[in-house]
Amino acid sequence: MEHAYQYSWIIPFVPLPIPILIGIGLLLFPTATKNLRRMWAFPNILLLSIVMIFSIDLSIQQINGSYIYQYVWSWTINNDFSFEFGYFIDSLTSIMSILITTVGIFVLIYSDNYMSHDQGYLRFFAYMSLFNTSMLGLVTSSNLIQIYIFWELVGMCSYLLIGFWFTRPAAANACQKAFVTNRIGDFGLLLGILGFYWITGSFEFQXLFEIFNNLIYNNEVHLLFVTLCASLLFAGAVAKSAQFPLHVWLPDAMXGPTPISALIHAATMVATGIFLVARLLPLFIVIPYIMNLISLIGIITVLLGATLPLAQKXIKRGLAYSTMSQLGYMMLALGMGSYRAALFHLITHAYSKALLFLGSGSIIHSMEAVVGYSPEKSQNMVLMGGLRKHAPITQIAFLIGTLSLCGIPPLACFWSKDEILSDSWLYSPIFAIIAWSTAGLTAFYMFRIYLLTFEGHLNIYFQKYSGKKSSSFYSIKLWGKEEQKMINRNFRLFPLLTMNKNEKPYTIGGNVKKRALITNFGYKEAFSYPHESDNTMLFPMLILVLFTLFVGAIAIPLNQEGMHLDILSKLXXPSINXLHKNSNDFEDSYQFLTNATFSVSIAGFGIFTAFLLYKPFYSSLLNLNLLNSFSKKGPKRIFLDKIIYLIYDWSYXRGYIDTFYSISLTKGIRGLAELTHFFDRRVIDGITNGVGITSFFVGEGIKYXGG
């Protein structure tokens, strides 16, 4: 056992040779390295698999003994200051290591096929290896300085991967937005680290917690300053985990390749903020107002993330907002002191969201056979529909991931989300009402994504790329902005949006297949059609389906004879849980079934509403009299229309938050820069030049007067 812990320092460095070797190969043997580029996927996956096996071994030992192991090397700079660096192994480290490596392996296998056509294949795998190294280094860090170093490396890798296709303006702008937004949080994190070092004189976690608790107990610190430092630490987590108000980078980050979206949203970048708060929870929990702040930010993010996807048309952006909402649930749980529930939801959400993003990548990959390489079209849900016929395996996998995120038993997210929802009643009834309501909204918008993508007919064939409408039906927009003439123009809630007809698709060679004939409402023409992805992409999705089905069993919260399956509590013990002081205080069967029935009912209502509004659209057009009967004018209908327009505008405009930042911050900073430039050129330079000119004329005058 001791040997496993002693060699744990190697965990972050195992994947590191790959980017180094790729760089050396491209520098010394560029032609051979590029010709053999597909070879690099295997050692990448192999090295990460070694780390996964090592992490599983550590977790087994943690379950058996709940050990905390720390090894520190000291570097003495002078007699007054020494820098210590090392590694810290506990249950949180082992859980995060397993999460990073398992999801990372599946994403790498998937990426081998997904990125095979891309000229940046080698660069992508080098960035991915460096990303995994940075995350593993972060979770094994023994002090705040190491955390900050790897924190910055994670941010750098995300910048490189989000802007992987940097020639596309959308990707270039997205990586800059992510970088700048995270710099705000990183600056706060650095100030918070320095503040706590000034208070305690230590960066090491165990020494920091012990010294700080003694200072608080003896009332030897200024509470306002401590609260400020803790808030600055939390600001770093807010930015990285896309919490309000620093969440604006996350939807735009979808401009990167889909595999990296899966990794960022499941187990790497957005998980770092949750990890940081979980790691520093012994510090936060003794500061009176910080836990309230964490839970408040969490519940605001939950609500915001559940309302913004309601009118999004890009499939990846809708999933990005769902990630934001689920991260809000985790942050809410940490703010409530429910450490175990937050960690449980982090695990279950990671596998479910990885499955959904890989599924969306499979969808986008198949749609590119129809629309060519055009992200605005290949990711547009309203041009999809009917993909269940063309990609049945992807459809089943995506449906399982969707049901899990909705909280339907016995899938993974049901167990963790239900635990957070149950704990919220013990913390605050207001927060509980918001959390339960957003659970229904989650089910609604997730099934909206599923129905628009897989059910009905392939909507792309209702409009030609030239912009000429092949069917009058395609004049319909979502929420009734514009409609077909046969229907009353005030009817709302159609699940279609018009496409951007000004953008040309770019066909990828060898990626287009032809169908002899497709008949859509009497319209006949030979079309390209979507197709199921290759086995290399389907295999990791099927493995993630198994994780989504069974990973919830590690922490089923029942404490009955013969049903004690709660492995997570053994792994996380001793852990902080302010809501359940007694470690044996779990739900009995009746309480669990009551809460579960209520949560499933709310999710079922959201799914039912989505089916009503987003059922296959063209079949509903067969009964135009019924549709027109719904659209009759009246005071209630006018009021409902106003509510619908309000919801649509709120969601489509991203809650006006990006607009507010653009006006108040971007334009304000640019205006300040222009004012500074004007002041520098006209005033500062004017004074300098004026002094010079004055000296010249005075000298000339003296020269003239003196003869």
UniProtKB/Swiss-Prot annotation:
A single Gene Ontology CC term: chloroplast thylakoid membrane
UniProt signal peptide: none
Recorded GO MF terms: NADH dehydrogenase (ubiquinone) activity; quinone binding
Entry keyword Ribonucleoprotein: no
Catalytic activity: a plastoquinone + NADH + (n+1) H(+)(in) = a plastoquinol + NAD(+) + n H(+)(out); a plastoquinone + NADPH + (n+1) H(+)(in) = a plastoquinol + NADP(+) + n H(+)(out)
InterPro entries on file: NADH_UbQ_OxRdtase_chlpt_su5_C, NADHpl_OxRdtase_5_subgr, ND/Mrp_TM, NU5C-like, Proton_antipo_N
GO biological process: ATP synthesis coupled electron transport; electron transport coupled proton transport
Membrane topology: Multi-pass membrane protein
Cell compartment(s), UniProt: Plastid, Chloroplast thylakoid membrane
Top-level enzyme category: translocase
Main subcellular location of this protein, as a coarse class: plastid
Record EC number: 7.1.1.-
NCBIfam families registered for this protein in UniProt: NDH_I_L, PRK06590.1
Family (UniProt): Belongs to the complex I subunit 5 family.
Protein name as it appears in the record: NAD(P)H-quinone oxidoreductase subunit 5, chloroplastic
Lineage: Eukaryota, Viridiplantae, Streptophyta, Embryophyta, Tracheophyta
